[in-house]
């Protein structure tokens, strides 16, 4: 086998007839497959052993030669070479066609490549190819023109009139003649000349033709190769035929399609030999053309060829495209050996880096390792007996398994793997039963619960894989979430509840005010029930044995909680107080997150993981001790409720009357009613919350962040309030009851609308979110950190994102973990807070915001000058580790996952604004999609093109806003009916400012404000959607994606470069072409940055493998083949497809020459053979 890692690129081009014959091992002449009696392949048929190789290893067809010793011998009786049967997966055959046929991809694709080259409309071309009309090949001295289309009658007339003076033909043969006579160089010069003169539609067509001509010129493809004289036959094992139980056969559709081609081809040969009448031959040629079309791409033209049950047959193109096609099913998603799956159960006794693996599963997964060990330890004499021991599960096996398994990490994965934390490594511990045990703290990352979820286990086999699992993927190394750098292993539910209960402080309880000499005495007093867990006591705290110490006051629970928590996390200023407890506050979920975050930054992951296990144990222990439960009596309905509701009802009646008298419109009445009930619900809730005891169990659950929220308490003990109906419109009749009192039938019915919509939305959202993630991954998969610093001096100016007075994202979050471009100087003290080029750490970012600095220039992926990917300095800190990012980190994929993973949490709703036209502003997931696809948004806002002063004029007919700039230039905007004007009379506007409410078209911003303006807009708008849902995502992820959306230039004028007008070029390729033109003293090309949506950007990538495996497979491959594209295997996807190591992380070139030394494992290879 050739070394996979040896080639640098992969090229695709048109195959010439000679090339197809060269690939082939023989011609397939008969449509037969296998003999129905002997079940052996027929000679010269579709499964012929002479052409494709033997069906059995080392055995010829007739049985004269059997065994390995005849390797390479060609049998003199049956002509089959004695070799391995797997050659049937690689040997190809061919069919010599009696008449040429066209390749449907090049004739039928959009735009039709054949049509553009011949300058014919696809319709006329189709008539010629399918024998409905004649085409003039050589007009001779007649008044006919070349490529003129003649009907049957016109042709007959012309023959009568001119006789043999001209030449016309039909079918692929005629087209082939025309294609052969094309002079590409002359055509290129002619088209470029035309381009300078033409405008409008003509120019567009000329550019398209020029593109195809250039593609053929540069790729050295011959246009005539778009017509096939020979059809290749793919290897038989890729279109298998298998016998089913009932003696029937199941076969691949391709065999049917090939059979049709062979039958029609043979019939045509026979007719030609017989010299049949022209009309019959023509019909047969047409049928052959249709058969080849169906084989290549069934259903592309006309009705698809169907099999039994009217099912369209799967052609070669169908084998490649879609989710079940070759690319996505087999090349990008392979099934792997050494894996298993089982149900998960919780394992609270596990350490943070451990998982419980069922014994039987472990034995099966580690079978070869166990067998090797059994032979080594002399339990078995050879591999075969070791295998028998394992299969019979002898008692010695378990001891050996324990040894093998220790120090050998396994990978656990839960589908759907939405981000990289969906696969983590653990050290396995053998457990009884058949369920995998999972540590409770990693559930958040996996989004796992124990209601029947299943997980898959994978065994990393090689030493390299084990090293990577241990040092990069072990759960301890995944404490922070890559999307925002916050801890993702925060305790949840019971653990939070226990910690909250433990750290509550109560007045006047048993043992309050007692003084203890040390912590042990306190613990003894608590265990003997002499002091309450919540009592405030004093304990003498010492830093060492010699230290006299100091009395510290806190609750018993907080002393217990602090026992194993590092006391230098920064909650207490240790310069002022050495002895106070570090965590001397009520521990809610958020507070615990802060503790973990500070511990990680201060002490790293090892100490943090020990602390996490301690918090977990405490939490479970004290939530059990606290015995916090839910009872009906915990929900007290506030007494003020009845009074508040009756007041609201009176107000609603008042509005009804006013409406009936015609004092207010129905719209106003509706809005006032909704407002009244919303206020009332709030008041009832406030009354309820004020009346709840701090020790009320339901309040404890909600307040601690363990489960439930204020909104749910309202529904239990207050009133449910207003509900939405299926269209998302609020129903004006509220639900006055709560769940404690029970709902009336009508109320229950009202609430079902919104509830069902919620469920339907969730199902749709999951699919949409998954598709968005897929597109994001595809557009950014080749963004890898390729160098430490690209050396650029530019970046972006970060300031807080605001919407009016409301802050969407504070400056702190935008600058932390980034490199500064200039020295950042304190405005008052004039000290340098952060020197030029340094990372802005948390404390520096806090100092900057406290100093009142509003703008900070930072390095950004948006301004990075790395040719492929981005550089480490522009990217900044790796959020998952808190360290500067390393070369080789696949930041593009991380960005896509970070944006896509919370996608399911976003809502689907479109937001109804009041007003008649009610312009719907899209929100939630559809809004994110709209932004990344750079679509024209719904509810479009009008924006100002110039800067200047506003003048608003209203007449009966229309409203107008006029903007006048300093040079007295005036632009007038007509405001459509129902739009809300955002600006005020006399206001000064900047270019790009909104005049009416709504969303702005990003293409307008690009035109008016330029690239930086549109980048800022995309980041701000995406952040707005996510922050509204309470999801924090770091800006740099959105920057990586928007960098990809703006990485192309649309060429306007080509100048003296080789670029084509209207083509999309890579920014760096464009600069290079211009540089070359200027050096040669020519005119450079002009162009503008194009804003592409993520789907378009993915398909515009330089790698044809990546684009083909994404969408529109046939279109991408057609174009790539004509251009003779070469894929330089820069991104991850291309390398996965061809089976190379990905060029990220340890797969980068710089790590190629590192060898890993280990004990030799030749034994294992031998075991593999046995298995």
Curated annotation (Swiss-Prot):
Reaction catalysed by this enzyme: RNA(n) + a ribonucleoside 5'-triphosphate = RNA(n+1) + diphosphate
Uppermost EC category: transferase
One GO location term (cellular component): DNA-directed RNA polymerase complex
Cofactor: Mg(2+); Zn(2+)
UniProt keyword terms in alphabetical order: DNA-directed RNA polymerase, Magnesium, Metal-binding, Nucleotidyltransferase, Transcription, Transferase, Zinc
Pfam families: RNA_pol_Rpb1_1, RNA_pol_Rpb1_2, RNA_pol_Rpb1_3, RNA_pol_Rpb1_4, RNA_pol_Rpb1_5
Entry binding sites for Mg(2+): 449, 451, 453
Sequence positions that bind Zn(2+) 2: 790, 864, 871, 874
Annotated cofactor note: Binds 1 Mg(2+) ion per subunit.
EC number: 2.7.7.6
A GO molecular function held by the record: DNA-directed RNA polymerase activity
Region (Disordered): 299-319
Binding locations of Zn(2+) 1: 60, 62, 75, 78
SUPFAM superfamilies, alphabetized: beta and beta-prime subunits of DNA dependent RNA-polymerase
GO biological process, one term: DNA-templated transcription
Summary of subunit composition and partner proteins: The RNAP catalytic core consists of 2 alpha, 1 beta, 1 beta' and 1 omega subunit. When a sigma factor is associated with the core the holoenzyme is formed, which can initiate transcription.
Similarity comment: family membership: Belongs to the RNA polymerase beta' chain family.
Function comment: DNA-dependent RNA polymerase catalyzes the transcription of DNA into RNA using the four ribonucleoside triphosphates as substrates.
Record protein name field: DNA-directed RNA polymerase subunit beta'
Encoding gene, per UniProt annotation: rpoC
């Amino acid at each position: 086998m050739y070394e996979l890692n040896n080639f640098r690129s992969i090229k695709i081009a048109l195959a010439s007839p000679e090339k197809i014959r060269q690939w082939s091992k023989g011609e397939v002449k008969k449509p037969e497959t296998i003999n129905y009696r002997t079940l052996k392949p027929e000679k010269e048929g579709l499964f012929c052993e002479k052409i494709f190789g033997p069906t059995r290893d080392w055995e010829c067809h007739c049985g004269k030669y059997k065994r390995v010793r005849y390797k390479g011998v060609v049998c003199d009786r049956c002509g089959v070479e004695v070799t391995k049967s797997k050659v049937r997966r690689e040997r190809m055959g061919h069919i010599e066609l009696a008449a040429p046929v066209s390749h449907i991809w090049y004739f039928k694709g959009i735009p039709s490549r054949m049509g553009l080259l011949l300058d014919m409309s696809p319709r006329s071309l189709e008539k010629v190819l399918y024998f409905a009309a004649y085409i003039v090949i050589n007009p001779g001295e007649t008044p006919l023109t070349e490529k003129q289309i003649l009907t049957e009658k016109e042709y007959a007339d012309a023959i009568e009139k001119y006789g043999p003076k001209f030449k016309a033909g039909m079918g692929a043969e005629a087209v082939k003649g025309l294609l052969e006579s094309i002079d590409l160089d002359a055509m290129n010069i002619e088209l470029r000349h035309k381009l300078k003169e033409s405008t409008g539609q003509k120019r567009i067509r000329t550019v398209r033709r020029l593109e195809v001509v250039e593609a053929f010129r540069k790729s050295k493809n011959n246009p005539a190769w778009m017509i096939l004289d020979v059809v290749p036959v793919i290897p038989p094992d890729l279109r298998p035929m298998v016998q089913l139980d009932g003696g029937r056969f199941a076969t691949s559709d391709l065999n049917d399609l090939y059979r049709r081609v062979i039958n029609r081809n043979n019939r045509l040969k026979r007719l030609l030999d017989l010299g049949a009448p022209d009309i019959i031959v023509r019909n047969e040629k047409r049928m052959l053309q249709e058969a080849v079309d169906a084989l290549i791409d069934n259903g592309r033209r006309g009705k698809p060829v169907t099999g039994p049950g009217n099912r369209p047959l799967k052609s070669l193109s169908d084998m490649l495209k879609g989710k079940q096609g070759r690319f996505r099913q087999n090349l990008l998603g392979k099934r792997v050996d050494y894996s298993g799956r089982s149900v998960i159960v919780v394992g609270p006794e596990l350490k943070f880096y451990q998982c419980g693996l069922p014994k039987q599963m472990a034995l099966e997964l580690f079978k070869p390792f166990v067998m090797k060990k059994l032979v080594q330890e002399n339990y078995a004499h050879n591999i075969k007996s070791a295998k028998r021991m394992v299969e019979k599960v002898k008692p010695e096996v378990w001891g050996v398994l324990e040894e093998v398994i220790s120090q050998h990490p396994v990978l656990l994965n839960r589908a759907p793997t939405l981000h990289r934390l969906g696969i983590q490594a653990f050290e396995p511990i053998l457990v009884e039963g058949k369920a995998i045990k999972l540590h409770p703290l990693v559930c958040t990352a996996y989004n796992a619960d124990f209601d029947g979820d299943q997980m898959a286990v994978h065994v990393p086999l090689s030493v390299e894989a084990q090293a990577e699992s241990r040092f990069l993927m072990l759960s301890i190394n995944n404490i922070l979430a890559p999307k925002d750098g916050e801890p993702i292993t925060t305790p949840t539910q019971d653990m939070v509840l226990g910690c909250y209960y433990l750290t509550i402080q109560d007045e006047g309880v048993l043992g309050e005010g007692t003084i203890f000499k040390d912590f042990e005495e306190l613990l003894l007093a608590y265990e003997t029930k002499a002091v309450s867990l919540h009592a405030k006591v004093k304990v003498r705290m010492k830093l060492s044995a010699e230290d006299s110490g100091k009395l510290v006051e806190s609750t018993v629970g907080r002393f217990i909680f602090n026992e194993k928590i590092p006391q230098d996390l920064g909650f207490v200023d240790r310069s002022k107080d050495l002895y106070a407890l570090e965590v001397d506050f009520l521990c809610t979920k958020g507070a615990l997150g802060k503790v973990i975050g500070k511990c990680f930054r201060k002490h790293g992951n090892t100490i943090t993981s020990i602390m996490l296990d301690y918090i977990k144990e405490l939490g479970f222990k004290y939530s059990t001790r606290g015995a916090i439960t839910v009872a009906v009596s915990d929900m007290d309905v506030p007494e003020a409720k009845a009074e508040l509701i009756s007041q609201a009802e009176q107000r609603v009646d008042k509005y009804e009357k006013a409406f009936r008298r015609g004092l207010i419109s129905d719209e106003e009445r509706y809005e006032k009613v909704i407002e009244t009930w919303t206020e009332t619900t709030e008041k009832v809730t406030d009354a309820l919350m004020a009346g709840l005891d701090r020790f009320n169990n339901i309040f404890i659950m909600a307040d601690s962040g363990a489960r439930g929220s204020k909104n749910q308490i309202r529904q239990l003990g207050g009133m449910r309030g207003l509900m939405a109906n299926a269209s998302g419109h609020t129903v004006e009749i509220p639900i006055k009851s709560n769940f404690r009192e029970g709902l009336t039938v009508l109320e229950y019915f009202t609430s079902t609308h919104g509830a069902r919509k919620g469920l339907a939305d969730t199902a749709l959202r999951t699919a949409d979110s998954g598709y968005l993630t897929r597109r994001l991954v595809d557009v950014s998969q080749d963004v890898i950190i390729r160098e430490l610093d690209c050396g650029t001096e530019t970046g972006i100016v970060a300031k807080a994102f605001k919407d009016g007075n409301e802050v969407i994202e504070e400056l702190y979050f935008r600058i932390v973990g980034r490199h500064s471009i200039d020295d950042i100087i304190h405005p008052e003290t004039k000290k340098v807070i952060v020197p030029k080029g340094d990372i802005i750490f948390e404390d520096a970012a806090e100092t900057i915001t406290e100093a009142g600095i509003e703008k900070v220039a930072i390095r950004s992926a948006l301004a990075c000058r790395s040719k492929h990917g981005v550089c480490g300095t522009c990217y900044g800190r790796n959020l998952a580790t808190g360290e500067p990012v390393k070369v080789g980190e696949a930041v593009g994929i991380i960005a896509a996952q970070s944006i896509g993973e919370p996608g399911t949490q976003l809502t689907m709703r479109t937001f109804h604004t009041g007003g008649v036209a009610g312009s719907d502003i899209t929100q939630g997931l559809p809004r994110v999609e709209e932004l990344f696809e750079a679509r024209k948004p719904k509810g479009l806002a009008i924006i100002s093109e110039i800067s200047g002063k506003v003048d608003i004029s209203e007449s009966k007919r229309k409203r107008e806003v006029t903007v006048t700039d300093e040079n007295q230039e005036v632009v007038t905007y007509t405001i459509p009916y129902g739009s809300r004007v955002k600006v005020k009379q006399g206001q000064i506007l900047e270019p790009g400012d909104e005049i009416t409410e709504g969303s702005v078209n990003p293409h307008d911003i690009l035109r008016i404000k330029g690239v930086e303006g549109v980048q800022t807009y995309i980041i701000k708008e995406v952040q707005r959607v996510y922050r509204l849902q309470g999801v924090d995502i770091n800006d740099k992820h959105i920057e990586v994606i928007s960098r990809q959306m703006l990485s192309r230039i649309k060429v306007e004028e080509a100048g003296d470069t080789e670029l084509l007008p209207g083509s999309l070029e890579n920014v760096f390729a464009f600069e290079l072409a211009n540089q070359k033109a200027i050096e040669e003293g020519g005119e450079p090309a002009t162009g503008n940055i194009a804003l592409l949506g993520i789907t378009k950007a993915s398909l515009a990538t330089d790698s044809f493998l990546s684009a083909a495996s994404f969408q529109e497979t046939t279109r991408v491959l057609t174009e790539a083949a004509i251009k003779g594209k070469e894929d330089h295997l820069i991104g991850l996807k291309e390398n996965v497809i061809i089976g190379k190591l990905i060029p990220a992380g340890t797969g980068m070139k710089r790590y190629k020459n590192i060898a890993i030394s280990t004990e030799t494992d030749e034994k294992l290879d031998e075991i593999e053979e046995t298995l």
